[in-house]
Amino acid sequence: MLLALDVGNTNTVLGLYGLEGDNPGPAIVSADNGSGEGSANPRLAAHWRVTTHRARTVDEYGVLFVNLFEMHGISTSVVTHIIIASVVPPVDSTLRQVCEKYFHVDPMFVEPGIKTGMPMLVDNPTELGADRLADCVAAYARYGGPCIVVDFGTATKFEVISARGEYLGGAISPGLGISADALFSHAARLTRVDIKRPSKVIGTNTIGHLQSGIFFGYIGLVDGILERILGELGAGTQPHIVATGGLARMIAADSRFIQDIDEMLTLEGLRILFERNRNARPRGRAQEARSSGQGARTEARVGERQG
């Protein structure tokens, strides 16, 4: 089976996928991760979300991951492949050692040179984060194009994919959580409040004022950027707009533009990237990128600009 790790600044999300030809037997008892919600993807056997800690040791991460498997009656021996998308370089070496020590697998990292199948029409494709790349690949595979992905995490990322499956670019905004943190850290007399959707915009006390401004102000940011993206794409373009990320369910319901919520989109993108690269990298280590002259538009790689 394939273990996919989406390593973000705040959380690390793990997904366990069945691969074609796998026969996991009784080890996988259901597609429920314990949260009461089964996976929309029948190949996703289980998934977990943990806090990303840069100071965790190899053994601390290893014990944590093994315990997650054991809590769901899954043996770590079912893992034959691992793919990692990380935006936290300090933990990369630690996670590689975790994979080798506790799963006996040499992981594949999403990094420059990986085959994406998506032309990158941007100035510097190597700047695109691994999680953003996975989002784009999964969104186009699942919804077709044109489409827009809004990933709500520590930062909120907007990704735009054309009707032909080309990555056109996007935008990055401070996430809802760090936006609120900035307010509380710079305004000494304001009391920190829980971030949640208030019942009305016009608050009647300081807590209500803050929750309204933070939440509905952020909805305005999201819809404002989406409206401008749609304007640049032109009136004849009607992209499918999907939200993902840890805060997607909280925010997307109030958006005027977001049509779907797909919380497993990044993990699905990692699964797709693994399938596209498993033969080229049988042990999961990144190989040297092919010469730029070999990159076809339908087989673009990170680090190669197409078009």
Label every PLM stretch briefly.
Residues 65-81, 225-239:
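Phosphate/pyrophosphate-binding loops at sites that engage ATP/ADP/AMP, CoA/4′-phosphopantetheine
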Residues 2-6, 83, 147-151, 242:
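Short glycine-aspartate micro-motif
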Residues 117-147, 271-278:
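Conserved phosphate-binding catalytic cores of ATP/NTP-utilizing and phosphoryl-transfer enzymes
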Residues 72-128, 164-170, 175-176, 204-215, ...:
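Short beta-strand-loop/turn "lid" adjacent to the catalytic site in phosphate-handling enzymes
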Residues 2-71, 166-189, 196-197, 208:
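Short glycine-rich, Thr/Ser-proximal phosphate-binding strand/loop in the N-terminal lobe
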Residues 12-18, 149, 156-161:
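Short beta-strand scaffold segments in enzyme catalytic cores
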Residues 1-4, 24, 52, 179-288, ...:
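ATP-binding/phosphotransfer module of carbohydrate and carboxylate kinases, centering on a glycine-rich
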Residues 18-43, 280-306:
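Intrinsically disordered, low-complexity terminal tails and inter-domain linkers enriched
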